[in-house]
């Protein structure tokens, strides 16, 4: 049973509130809290000059600012603290604040606690954004007013009073957002799980436990959708309190969703043919199977089929940038883990020239070499992990005699220029880094846009 948002409005009036992080989602949050009558102090590592007009706007509204390297030193004496998702709950500043009696929360926790409308939460190591987007397209296609948020879309907490009982809310939720989530989510989807973000999580188990929070607080009416072919997500079944539905690209699941002989089935009814789906690759077949199960009570098979045959995909996900002299260039910048890169490579019908490497999340690259080599024609490595990735491919050669030609470069532009010189007519070049972007770019979107800019300049 969702709580009445009027309770929050009454609670927050006059409260001394700290908001950690002045990012995309927290700017509307801060403005909303001010409008609700809270006394807000915003904290950020950036300085006044870096914040620019944002700081000026907050100053005019009476928001206090704590900025710079030691910005958390004054996170004291607050009634409520909204933390940024990437801030660990066991950080020194938050531990101290909780001991002082502060209520520590996040925008997403409060949104899920109070929002009206059916909530669909999607998480996983790979496929979150595409599955989230497919689910939103299915619901919109059925005629529902649909709100998309979390890791994608727009910040929703400030829109909460515009969301109605009959609306649908679709949230992409990261492990960071889920670490402190204790709210019930009506429909929970976990696409798959593999090692990821181990630079932020203390262990793989902590990462898995964070993901479990998407379903662990459900009641008997909740629905959990998981991947039958992923050992970790399949294991979630024994802990689920509600209904569980599984999807598979490898076996028939009469009570779930499955792929067989070129056809996608939902509870043993044909939905569409694989070859008619616009976005290619078996990973996208799995994304559709998950989305079909998540929306089976709200969306007709006819709408599902139509969306599959018309939805053209999400930017930075195996996105065709252009074809030059018979060479196709794809932007798969979202591929920030080896498993995601493998999924992208398997979508092509031939060996490809791969540009990889980037920020080190402390996850193993062995799968990229030992499972990925059949799909790689040439490998161009860049970024902080290039030597680490090369070592794994060198081990592959030493152990199995399988050699992939590897080129080492210093920049993305050098990588693209080299790929252009190597490629022959009919070849495919893909940016599929298997790593995060933070060593070279602020996020995967900026990395992908830079790749597209370089390719378009060739």
Swiss-Prot record:
Residues holding ATP: 124-130
Enzyme class at the top of the EC tree: ligase
Instruction: Read off the InterPro entries from this record.
Output: Mur-like_cat_sf, Mur_ligase_C, Mur_ligase_C_dom_sf, Mur_ligase_cen, MurD
Cell division in keyword set: yes
GO MF terms here are: ATP binding; UDP-N-acetylmuramoylalanine-D-glutamate ligase activity
Q: Which domain of life is it from?
A: Bacteria
Give me the disulphide-bonded residues.
none
Keyword terms, alphabetized: ATP-binding, Cell cycle, Cell division, Cell shape, Cell wall biogenesis/degradation, Cytoplasm, Ligase, Nucleotide-binding, Peptidoglycan synthesis
Q: Which GO terms describe its cellular component?
A: cytoplasm
Question: Which GO BP terms, alphabetically?
Answer: cell division; cell wall organization; peptidoglycan biosynthetic process; regulation of cell shape
Query: Which catalytic reaction applies to this protein?
Result: UDP-N-acetyl-alpha-D-muramoyl-L-alanine + D-glutamate + ATP = UDP-N-acetyl-alpha-D-muramoyl-L-alanyl-D-glutamate + ADP + phosphate + H(+)
Asked if Ligase is a keyword of the record, the answer is yes
Q: Where in the cell is it found?
A: Cytoplasm
The pathway entry for this protein reads as: Cell wall biogenesis; peptidoglycan biosynthesis
E.C. number: 6.3.2.9
Entry similarity comment: Belongs to the MurCDEF family.
Its annotated function is as follows: Cell wall formation. Catalyzes the addition of glutamate to the nucleotide precursor UDP-N-acetylmuramoyl-L-alanine (UMA).
Name assigned to this protein: UDP-N-acetylmuramoylalanine--D-glutamate ligase
Highest classification ranks of the organism: Bacteria, Bacillati, Bacillota, Clostridia, Eubacteriales
